[in-house]
UniProtKB/Swiss-Prot annotation:
Swiss-Prot/TrEMBL site (Important for activity) positions: 99
Further comment: During catalysis, the active site Cys acts as a nucleophile attacking the alpha-carbonyl group of tRNA-bound glutamate with the formation of a thioester intermediate between enzyme and glutamate, and the concomitant release of tRNA(Glu). The thioester intermediate is finally reduced by direct hydride transfer from NADPH, to form the product GSA.
Organism from which the protein derives: Rhodococcus jostii (strain RHA1)
Protein name per the record: Glutamyl-tRNA reductase
Family per record: Belongs to the glutamyl-tRNA reductase family.
Swiss-Prot/TrEMBL domain comment: Possesses an unusual extended V-shaped dimeric structure with each monomer consisting of three distinct domains arranged along a curved 'spinal' alpha-helix. The N-terminal catalytic domain specifically recognizes the glutamate moiety of the substrate. The second domain is the NADPH-binding domain, and the third C-terminal domain is responsible for dimerization.
Disulfide bonds: none
Keyword entries, A-Z: NADP, Oxidoreductase, Porphyrin biosynthesis
Metabolic or biological pathway: Porphyrin-containing compound metabolism; protoporphyrin-IX biosynthesis; 5-aminolevulinate from L-glutamyl-tRNA(Glu): step 1/2
EC number: 1.2.1.70
One Pfam family linked to the record: Shikimate_DH
Length: 479
């Protein structure tokens, strides 16, 4: 069994495509069930954020599983396979693990080094675990990715600026609203989830004068407003139906609801700007961080209104990180990947070693029974001493080769040593499977038609070509 990753992100697709493939919290369990019902998939985890959707699946056949995941994404998004392949990327086996470690470290984020991705991976893993969709392979992969991400953030300065999508958006907004930035101004936060909480925290640090939290359920909005009040900021909680009235008071609006359909409409915005008492010259900056987008496109055409969406924020210089910090993070990812892969290879050879020792124990017991039949008068103390001696001899003979094969198997390409051990000692597949957990078994995948270059996969199968680049340098297709 190996891990297959199929993803679409801000690096390979424009916002309209990301909106189509976006997976909501409601969608995730349904799609996970569909993945598990597929012929070639035994484990599944879906990572979905405001700028990426990635499906991690443990598969027994690369081509078949790739076709199944691709068809599921096409059906979910409404995109045909031709359109989807232009924006999708594929990683397999070691390359899939490397990619997840980089994502968890913030190296693949729109804002390099942001920490929110760790929580999003944790959410994806918890959701998969709750559906019993994560077996040994995904448990170990996800847990190791979270550990790698934490280590990168604690040992490098990649997040020293505390940057996030929210901070970049609000920093841009501060420069638009006028002198003094956000200090003393009024902000509306739509949505009381993690992005809403992050927005309130950043607005508070920026010296905002007043925060209005708007949410479908007022109780959750009130909880977030209480957080703002606890930090000395005047705050109010409103239901979503009261959004136009709240907008009439706002200098800045931040929205990220994950809703299907516009939350901030042209009609509501026009009505808010026309409210008595609002200065016609007063700018309104709307930060649309939702995927799908929360703001109707026509809103950006209104006089005095600036809409900052994910596409415009992606071009912001503040989204970068210092080269030295990014290099240090990549070094950690590479080291952790090597350790993880060594552990995985060792786990693959362990059942073979166990089967060999079991085979030796069976031979010893058979020979002792033969001894009993030939020397029935042997008393118990003598028989016990003979048994101990034979077992010691066998253990000493097996110790060096089994320790050495574990060492060799943990190195890249080491799977051949386990195969050699099975061949030399005539260990049948059944005898190895008998001492292995079902999730420990390594599946045989025919990779003869697959060329893995720089972590990317290219091949001759037409289903494969729908989703991968034919660029031999391993660059994702942007066509």
């Amino acid at each position: 069994m190996s891990v297959l990753l199929v993803g679409v992100s801000h690096r390979t697709a424009p916002v309209p495509v990301l909106e189509r493939v976006a997976v909501t919290d409601t969608d995730r369990p349904k799609l996970t069930d569909k993945l598990l019902a597929s012929s070639h998939i035994s484990e599944a985890m879906i990572v979905s954020t405001c700028n990426r959707v990635e499906i991690y699946a443990v598969v027994d056949a690369f081509h078949g599983a790739l076709a199944e995941v691709g068809e599921l994404l096409a059906d979910h998004s409404g995109l045909d396979l031709t359109d989807l392949h232009r924006h999708a990327y594929v990683r397999y086996s070691e390359a899939a693990a490397e990619h997840l470690f980089a994502v968890a470290s913030g190296l693949d984020s729109m804002v390099i080094g942001e920490q929110q991705i760790l929580g999003q991976i944790r959410t994806a893993y918890a959701s998969s675990d709750a559906q019993q969709a994560a077996g040994r392979t995904l448990h170990e992969l996800a847990q190791q990715a979270l550990r790698v991400g934490k280590r990168v953030h604690s040992e490098t300065g990649i997040d020293s600026a505390g940057a996030s999508v929210v901070s970049v958006a609000l920093d841009r907004a501060a420069g638009i609203v006028g002198d003094g930035g956000l200090t003393g101004r009024t902000a509306v936060v739509v949505g009381a989830g993690s992005m809403g909480g992050l927005s309130v925290a950043h607005l508070t640090r920026a010296g905002i004068g007043r925060i209005v939290v708007v949410n479908r359920t007022k109780e959750r909005a009130e909880h977030l407003a209480d957080t703002a009040r606890a930090n000395g900021v005047e705050a109010e909680a409103l239901e979503l139906s009261e959004l136009p009235a709240a907008m009439a008071q706002a200098d800045v609006l931040v929205t990220c609801t994950g809703a299907v359909g516009a939350v901030v409409t042209l009609a509501d915005t026009h009505r808010a700007l026309a409210q008595p008492g609002r200065d016609a010259e007063r700018p309104l900056v709307i930060c649309d961080l939702g995927l799908p987008r929360d703001v109707e496109p026509a809103v950006s055409g209104l006089p005095g209104v600036t809409v900052l969406d994910m596409e415009s924020l992606q071009r912001d210089p503040a989204a970068g990180a210092a080269a030295s910090d990014a290099d240090a993070a990549r070094t950690i990812v590479a080291a952790e990947l090597a350790n993880y892969l060594a552990g995985q290879r060792l786990a693959e050879v362990t059942p073979t070693v166990t089967a060999l020792r079991q085979r030796a124990a069976d031979v010893v017991e058979a020979e002792l029974m033969r001894l009993d039949s030939r020397l029935p008068g042997l008393d118990d103390p003598e028989r016990d001493e003979v048994a101990r001696t034979v077992r010691r001899v066998v253990d000493k003979l097996l110790h060096a080769p089994t320790v050495r094969v574990k060492q060799l198997a943990s190195a890249p390409g080491g799977d051949s040593y386990a195969a050699a051990l099975r061949e030399l000692f005539e260990l049948s597949p059944g005898s190895v499977e008998a001492v292995a957990k079902p999730t420990d078994l390594g599946g045989a995948t025919d990779l003869s038609a697959i060329d893995i270059t720089d972590g990317f996969i290219a091949g001759q199968d037409p289903r494969l070509r729908r989703f991968v680049t034919d660029d031999n340098h391993g660059k994702e297709s942007q066509a």
